[in-house]
Structure formats: structure tokens, C-alpha cells
């Protein structure tokens, strides 16, 4: 949650982006993806006993294909999925690959690598399109257009399962009863909005368990961020009116809400109740603050996503703006992985199908240019959403102005990305030259530990590559070993490295370093699982420990390990570097490679500290009831409502526990025994 939890239970939301929201989520696991499609009736058509490949294989495969719609997959010799495609007629579409016509380099290479194919039929072409998009996202084939940085979008949730609804930031499935508003482009946008809504409507942000056990108002009530429904500082009717106003504001009726508050402010002034008038004035200012961050709020666009693409220099940027209830909920730039030779319209077409694979579809989608399968895409998304979806390219009026604005944003983001990518390529090349690497690294892993006297110890791993930091590859390691003494950084690093590379060996096997791809080939390959270089925050002692681990695992020749020791007085710019085959050395103070390494080390430090703080915070707020098997949120809430605190629960007798709603004799005895070692009554 992007906010600061106060000691007495309320939450103050801040306005920064929650950068690590998805950093600890593993990238889509290939085995899991395979299981998700294993239930489909995939048909290999025929048994390739003669070892055919390429055009010869496809030509034979076509003979066994039906004329019906469906999806096909192409595999290489190693069993990796090269491409997933869909067709109105499988026979005609796949047959195109086997004809002698001139293909693009990308298609020719894909055909040449193909050693096996499978297909599955669908009832309609729209079904085929949706299945294709789903498979591409999960299998991430090398030759498809791939959506990257596919983080879920945050929403604002106003709950409806309590007498006093609360307001929260929400991601994921909509399991909880309530009203959801969004999507917002970032956690920062949600934080800003909730922060202002707290000031404007005084809605609580505490959890239900805190709310039910309050005996006096919390700090948020004192600073006028909450109306205090927990202790009835506001009547239920008055609080319900505040919640209604908040919902109306988020539903697009902002002007009506502001007019009503302004009227109340004027009435208070006329009654010479200036203190109450000041409260209404502050509420109006908070609402204006929300709208000032929304930029354009077009009156003619009620619910729409607006997409624009700029394709140049081998990089595509797709910018999307979200409009809901006539309000702009923010924007985000995407840089899909695609063949540079593909036209922008084809990239945008493939992007849209994948984008909406797991996201709610609005009633209207506006594009900067026409895509090939516009009607089919609209029909497929409408079928998925359960309502009509229109996809159009505006030619005039307000919608055209909005689309042009989104396109201008796409061009600006594209220019920034192009500059960053060019700079990153130069830095990686300089890094390789500085450390005498045989090739430019594509994946660098940086490790750091964080703890306080050995408690809540966490190891952090961040990843950098040709396009900067790759946050969906970040990992945290909660130190589990009980043999590590407080402050034993060597022991912590040993555990982290052993766990990391043991799992990598199990899942990926050893990398083949004999076949290093050229820069051109590397650009077409998926991001590698194995690091080319690991950076360790430490000197000779840390490096000795790391080398010993790599030797034990038999991967010393697979990974280049480099130690980065802080300079005298821990001064930046005076770092010493430790690498195999050479004496330790320093870099000139203004060397770009030195700044690059410092930035990577600082990011690892930030991530490790953030993970440690999150673990420590979780430990501090842990409830003793959480440790009892069979006590879920519902029973815990009932116990706390009945007894007031967890300490009172621990002192309760067996008969007292049995009087609580939802607590049977068996569960009561389990709770009692947990807090009393003797287990007797």
C-alpha cells in the first residue's frame, strides 16, 4: 500500500509511485504457462519421422490442416515456442509460409528454425484472436510482438461491507464488495487522489479490525483527514452523505459536488460560522488539487482508452490515456518488443489484443491510426467484455484533439527512450572494456543485504540490461538460515547466492558461453535468465566467499563476479574493484562507467533496504492470532470485536471463547491451548 501507517491505525497516503509494487513478482513461468494451455486439444497433424524442418515441414503440415479458424504454434528443435498465430482459415494462413514467395528476414528466420508445429481449432475467428493474445502473453514467443512492463493497474476502492465504508488503493481481483474507480496509470496517481479525497470527504482509511476496536478518534481525525465514524464523532447519516459525495465526485459529477460544498460554505459564512466555512473552503481546495493533476478532462469522452503509436529508429512507443466518467485518470507509455521492420499499425494491432487480455475493456477505444483487424478486434473485445466496444480513428473535433495530444506524448516518450537506450548501450560497451569482458553483457545482477543486527535480514537482487533496470526481474531473499550470527554478511551472501544459482541451474541448466550472440542477434533474443556479470557490494572477503560458492556449484566459468568496495571514509568516487585475473583497481572520478556502477549499486541498496523495512514492518504489526491455524480474517475480527485486544483473547477462558460468534468448542480449545502450554482448562 502506497502510504504511511500511523501508530493508531489510520493511513496517510503519499504521492510517490510505488516502484516495487511488482518487483518481487516472478516473470511468467514457462512451465506454468504450459500447464495453462495443456488442457487444450492441440493437434500435431502428423508424426514427423523423417526429420523435416523449415518450409518442407510446413508444406507437409498444411496437408493436415482444416479450413476452419484456429491458432497454431511453431517450435524449434529445443522445444521452445517460436511463434503463435491465429487464422480465419488455418490451411490458407499456414500455407503462406510454405510458398516460395519472398519473406522478411524475420519470417524467413522463423521458418528456417521451425521443426515442429501444432494447431487447435476454435468456433470463430474472434475466439482465435483472444486465444492467440492469451498464449502470446504467457508463452512469450521469440518472433511475436510482445507487450512488456505489463503491470496491473491500481484502482480506488470504496468498500460496501461495513457500516462506515473505507477508501483504499486496490490491485488485482475485485473480490471485496464495494465500488471500484479507475484504472489509474500509477500508484502515485492513486495516492494523490486518495490523499485529496481524505481532505475533501473525511473518509476513513483504517482497516476494519482497527475500526472496530477504536475507543477514541485517531490522529487523522485530529488533523481533519477523517470524520471519526469509529467513535461516532459523525452520525451514520452524515458519514453516508460524505461517502455519497466522494462516489459522485469519482463518478464524474465533480461540478455538482463542488457547487453543493460551495453553497454550504456560503451558508456558514452568512451564519457567521467561520470555522465551519473554513472546513468547506479546505474541502473545495482539496478537490481542486485532484483536478489540477488530471490535465485534460474532455466533456465529450465519458469512458475511453486513447492509444497512439510512434515508430522510429527500431523502437516503438505506444502511449495510452485513460478516461473514465469524463475524467483523466492518467497515462502510461509502453515499449513493446517487435521486429523493427514491422509497420506501426501491425504492432499496435498485436499490442491491443494482449493489453486487454487481463484488463477491463472500456466502451470506446480511440486510435491514432487504423489497424488491420479493427472490426475483428472490436468484436472480440466486445465478446470478452459483455458489452459493445467501438474502435475508431477520430478525424475531427475534440476526440481528434485528444488523440493528437496522446500522439505528441508518444513522440516525446519515444525520444527520451531512444536517448536512454543509446546511452545505456554506450555504458554497457564501456563496462565490458573496463573489465576486459569478452562480450558486452546483456544481463547484470547486483546483490546487497540489509538487516539490523541480523534481524529481519533480507538479500536483494536487482537486474540491469540494454534498456536499463528490469524491475520485473528483481528478487528478494528472506534470510532463512538460523546459523548466521548477527552481522555475518558473508553468511547472508552465501545463502543468497546458493539459493539463486541452485534454482537457476535446476530451471535453466548451464548457459552455453561458447556461442555468444552478435549484437544484432541479441536484439532479437528474449532477455537471458543467466547473468553475464554479478556485482557484489563488498571487497576481497566478499569476493572470496562468492568465488567459493560458484566453485561449489561448478559455474565459476559461467558468470563473471566483480566486487565493489566502498572507498576511504565510504566516499563515493573512490571505490575499489575486485575481479578475477587482475589486481584491485579504481576508476577515474568522472568516468561514466563509474557513475553507471554507482547507480546500479545504489539501486540494489535501495531495493534491499525497502525489502528489509517491509519485512520489519510486517513483523512489528503481526498479530498473535495470525499464528493459530484455522483462524482466518473473519474469526479474528469476531474475537477482537468481542475481547478488544489480542492480549485479552490470550487471557480468556475456554467458556468465554466459546461465547464468541463463529467459535466452536474445537476452535476455542485450539485457541486456548495455543496460549496455555499446559493445554488444560
Swiss-Prot record:
Record carries keyword Cytoplasm: yes
Compositional bias per record (Acidic residues), positions renumbered to this chain: 14-23
Keyword tags: Cytoplasm, DNA damage, DNA excision, DNA repair, Excision nuclease, SOS response
Localization, UniProt: Cytoplasm
One BP term from GO: nucleotide-excision repair
Region (Disordered): 1-23
Record field: transmembrane: none
Gene3D superfamilies: 5' to 3' exonuclease, C-terminal subdomain, GIY-YIG endonuclease, UVR domain, UvrC, RNAse H endonuclease domain
DNA repair is among the record's keywords: yes
Record-annotated GIY-YIG domain positions: 67-145
GO MF annotations in UniProt: DNA binding; excinuclease ABC activity
Assembly and binders: Interacts with UvrB in an incision complex.
Function: The UvrABC repair system catalyzes the recognition and processing of DNA lesions. UvrC both incises the 5' and 3' sides of the lesion. The N-terminal half is responsible for the 3' incision and the C-terminal half is responsible for the 5' incision.
Name of the featured protein: UvrABC system protein C
Lineage: Bacteria, Pseudomonadati, Pseudomonadota, Alphaproteobacteria, Hyphomicrobiales
